[in-house]
């Protein structure tokens, strides 16, 4: 491909020129050949053509370092533009630490530590309890001349220290007084003219804020750090490594706990029942006392409507639905006539007792009228109970017995007359 590009570049153009000037063509070819940069193309990728000398992309994970010794109070003051105001005020800055300069960020001449001016909270040593002065112990072998010499040295040292401290206090007070007098127009202090605090406008504050902001990220920055890897890049800058758990010492959980939705209507401390199929496997040898469940097939027997005449005739409704092989054969019924007659006799006795009790109840209740009895007979005819009673052999025998009794009573009454 590189050879074809070279041949195409050296091939003379066949397009007609406007003025047919060969000198112009030669000059153009020389200029194009001198400005052309030949590069061998190896392959084409997502980002375009790739040459042979292209640097390989590093697969190392990205690390976002943490800014150390960051003073958020000083950063806020710089963004609001108060540093210049503090520098103009000088010694009138209130709430200033001893040994610190008026302008934050500028260390004093005596201090060599860079972090001495950082406004941190609770950095001073706290003093608690009673503080007792240690008295000097006098020994027996000390001579009076030595003791007197020591006392004289202490007195001279105290006398020399007091003027120095008073001079420092007087110097600070004098400097403050001079600054106040300079603000009223007296320039004898030598501190300059009147102190004017410059108040920045909104546009200046906005411009200062824009200048303090970092550069806007490009598309390459977003492509280099995916969204799901941004937090891990921050953790790597804080000292986290792959496979390290959370907490102190890296012994905590490695994966965050995922919240699980609680089942509906499930109280606190309750466990959800398994919703899968029940395990109906055979019991193990250890639990031999467990009996396996009966797995026989239960057939459904349909229930049909029964006729009340079957009950009156002494037949059960389920006898008609029984299969033929389960019904008793006629040969068995002929072999046992006595049992059949005994059942019939018992049934007749029950009906006779029921009729006597019903007649006795009607005779004992004088409040019943003929209209009520007629209604009951009408209901019986409508329900179809009277034909059953007439067709029943026990009811027929009762009527014959009552008619015979009536006939005997009439005969006896006729003989008496």
UniProtKB/Swiss-Prot annotation:
Underlying gene: SPP2
Lineage of source species: Eukaryota, Fungi, Dikarya, Basidiomycota, Ustilaginomycotina
Subunit and partners: Associated with the spliceosome.
Domain G-patch: 227-273
Protein name: Pre-mRNA-splicing factor SPP2
Compositional bias ranges of the Polar residues kind: 281-290
Keywords, ordered alphabetically: mRNA processing, mRNA splicing, Nucleus, Spliceosome
Composition bias, Basic and acidic residues: 201-214, 338-351, 370-417
GO biological process: mRNA splicing, via spliceosome
Region (Disordered): 1-70, 201-221, 240-417
Disulfide bonds: none
UniProt biased composition (Basic residues): 352-365
């Amino acid at each position: 491909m590189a050879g074809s590009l070279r041949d195409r570049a050296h091939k003379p153009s066949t397009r007609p020129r406007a003025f047919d000037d060969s000198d112009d063509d030669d000059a153009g070819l020389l200029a194009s050949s001198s400005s052309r940069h030949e590069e061998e193309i190896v392959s084409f990728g997502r980002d375009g053509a790739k040459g042979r000398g292209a640097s390989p992309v590093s697969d190392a994970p990205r690390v976002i370092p943490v800014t150390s010794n960051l003073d958020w109070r000083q950063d806020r003051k710089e963004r609001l533009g108060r540093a210049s105001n503090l520098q103009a005020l000088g010694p009138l800055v209130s709430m200033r630490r001893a040994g610190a300069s008026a302008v934050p960020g500028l260390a004093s001449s005596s201090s060599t530590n860079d972090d001495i001016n950082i406004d941190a909270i609770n950095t001073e040593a706290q003093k608690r309890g009673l503080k007792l002065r240690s008295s000097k112990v006098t020994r027996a072998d000390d001579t009076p001349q030595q003791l007197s010499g020591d006392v004289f040295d202490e007195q001279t040292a105290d006398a020399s220290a007091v003027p120095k401290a008073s001079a420092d206090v007087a110097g600070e007070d004098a400097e403050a007084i001079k600054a106040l007098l300079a603000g009223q127009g007296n320039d004898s202090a030598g501190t300059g003219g009147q102190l004017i605090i410059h108040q920045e406008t909104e546009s200046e504050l906005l411009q200062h804020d824009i200048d303090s902001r970092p550069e806007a990220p490009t598309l390459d920055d977003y492509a280099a750090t995916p969204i799901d890897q941004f937090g891990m890049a921050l953790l790597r800058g804080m000292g986290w490594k792959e496979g390290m758990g959370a907490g102190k010492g890296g012994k905590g959980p490695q994966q965050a706990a995922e919240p699980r939705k609680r089942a509906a209507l499930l109280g606190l401390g309750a466990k959800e029942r398994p919703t899968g199929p029940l395990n109906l496997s055979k019991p193990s040898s250890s639990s031999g006392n467990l009996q396996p469940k009966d797995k026989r097939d239960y057939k459904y027997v349909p229930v049909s409507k029964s006729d009340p005449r079957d009950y009156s005739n002494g037949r059960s409704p389920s006898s008609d639905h029984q299969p033929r092989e389960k019904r008793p054969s006629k040969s068995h019924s002929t072999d046992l006539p006595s049992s059949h007659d005994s059942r019939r006799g018992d049934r007749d006795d029950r009906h006779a007792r029921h009729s006597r009790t019903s007649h006795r109840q009607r005779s004992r209740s004088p409040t019943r009228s003929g209209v009520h009895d007629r209604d009951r007979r009408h209901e019986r005819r409508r329900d179809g109970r009277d034909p059953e009673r007439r067709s029943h052999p026990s009811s027929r025998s009762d009527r014959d017995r009552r008619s015979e009794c009536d006939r005997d009573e009439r005969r006896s009454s006729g003989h008496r007359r």
